[in-house]
């Protein structure tokens, strides 16, 4: 399952880079409340409550953690102590927003906050800072979008773990069992194969496969069903796996096999289009063009991919209109799908990492339509 966080040196480097990016943006500091950004910067998995917990990161100066005194024990699970971060604890009746302002040098001060900060903290913080904060998305997104070697290693291990789960899926796909039965087996396997927890399980059989985000239900599997299985878990220091394969219970009809072969070609075309200097929308177009030529464009109803890391869905998004230029270290899914309402659907998904001259996949289980024999 891996360590729950990285060594302190990793977080120290990230804090320094975030402070530099903050200064480059002309801001006095960042205020990071619990969420993926806080986990990225100091390895904290704190949750947002009505009491303010925040990492305050000045563009120049020492960072500090402002948090309720009752949360001091939980802070020890992060890298804060090893990093030597100043702790500004407070008790009920104190003004935590004033503490944040003081760390940043007093109001008024131009500050960025994470997009996960709730209004119950944003509004009093704006009063304390004397100016409405801006979102820190642009400051932090580049850091999180380009993965370090430690992150890539975690994604590779997560990918290998989810491959092992897919290798076990055929044994679960027995006619007469429900999607929920299969999902329960898969969830157990996700943890058994090395994840710390289950992120999601989609088991879409027959017509349910035409709903990309179906989930699972009490529908019983039947011979002839095409089954979309999209699964993911959390590995080690919070990094995710996410992989989709499509299964056929018994031999598929010829029209299913033909359409699926076009989907394979589309997924391969997108993968082969990836290299530094290419834009995200060009990768999306590579998959979409193959399906359009096959007369299947109207059945591909979502983007080709999404970034992945601490969050299952994060930047970069592989979608039409996104002119973001790909660089080595970016990690994202390639997952074209075709969906025939009321009939069946199919999707193939791998997580890939941009390299100096192309891309590598962290998933290596078969891309073919996987036929599950019926006894």
From Swiss-Prot:
CC cofactor note: Binds 2 manganese ions per subunit.
One Pfam family here: Creatinase_N
Cellular compartment(s): Cell membrane
Enzyme class, broadest EC rank: hydrolase
Transmembrane segment boundaries: 15-35, 55-75
Entries under InterPro entries matching the protein: Creatin/AminoP/Spt16_N, Creatinase/aminopeptidase-like, Creatinase_N, Pept_M24, Peptidase_M24B, Peptidase_M24B_aminopep-P_CS
BP GO terms, sorted: proteolysis
One Gene Ontology cellular component annotation held by this UniProt entry: plasma membrane
Keyword Cell membrane attached: yes
Keyword Transmembrane: yes
Family to which this protein belongs: Belongs to the peptidase M24B family.
Protein name: Probable dipeptidase PepE
Species name: Mycobacterium tuberculosis (strain ATCC 25618 / H37Rv)
Protein encoded by which gene: pepE
């Amino acid at each position: 399952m891996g360590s729950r966080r990285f060594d302190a040196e990793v977080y120290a480097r990230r804090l320094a880079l975030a402070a530099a990016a903050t200064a480059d943006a002309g801001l006095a500091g960042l205020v990071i409340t619990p969420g993926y950004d806080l986990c990225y910067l100091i390895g904290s998995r704190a949750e947002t409550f009505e009491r303010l917990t925040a990492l305050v990161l000045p563009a120049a100066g020492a960072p500090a953690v402002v948090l309720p005194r009752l949360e001091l024990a939980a802070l020890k699970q992060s890298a804060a102590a090893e990093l030597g971060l100043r702790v500004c604890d407070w008790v009920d009746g104190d003004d935590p927003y004033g503490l944040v302002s003081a760390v940043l040098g007093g109001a008024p001060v131009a500050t960025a906050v994470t997009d996960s900060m709730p209004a119950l903290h944003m509004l009093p913080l704006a009063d304390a800072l004397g100016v409405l904060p801006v979102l820190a998305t642009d400051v932090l997104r580049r850091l999180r979008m380009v993965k370090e070697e430690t992150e890539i290693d975690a994604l590779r291990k997560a990918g290998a773990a989810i491959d092992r789960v897919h290798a076990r899926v055929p044994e679960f796909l027995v006619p007469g069992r429900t999607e929920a039965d299969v999902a329960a087996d898969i969830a157990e396997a996700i943890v058994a194969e090395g994840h710390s927890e289950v992120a999601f399980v989609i088991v879409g059989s027959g017509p349910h496969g035409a709903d990309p985000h179906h989930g699972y239900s009490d529908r019983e599997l039947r011979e002839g069903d095409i089954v979309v299985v999209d699964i993911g878990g959390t590995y080690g220091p919070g990094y995710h796996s996410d992989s989709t394969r499509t299964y056929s219970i018994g031999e598929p009809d010829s029209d299913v096999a033909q359409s699926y072969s076009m989907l394979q070609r589309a997924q391969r075309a997108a993968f082969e289009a990836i290299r530094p200097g290419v834009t995200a929308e060009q990768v999306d177009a590579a998959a979409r063009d193959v399906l359009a030529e096959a007369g299947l464009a109207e059945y591909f109803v979502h983007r080709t991919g999404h970034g992945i890391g601490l969050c299952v869905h994060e930047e970069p998004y592989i979608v039409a209109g996104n002119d973001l230029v790909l660089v080595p270290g970016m990690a994202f899914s390639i997952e074209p799908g075709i969906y025939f309402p009321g009939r069946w659907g199919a999707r193939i998904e791998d997580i890939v990492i941009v390299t100096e001259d192309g891309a590598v996949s962290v998933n290596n289980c078969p891309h073919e339509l996987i036929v599950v024999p019926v006894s």
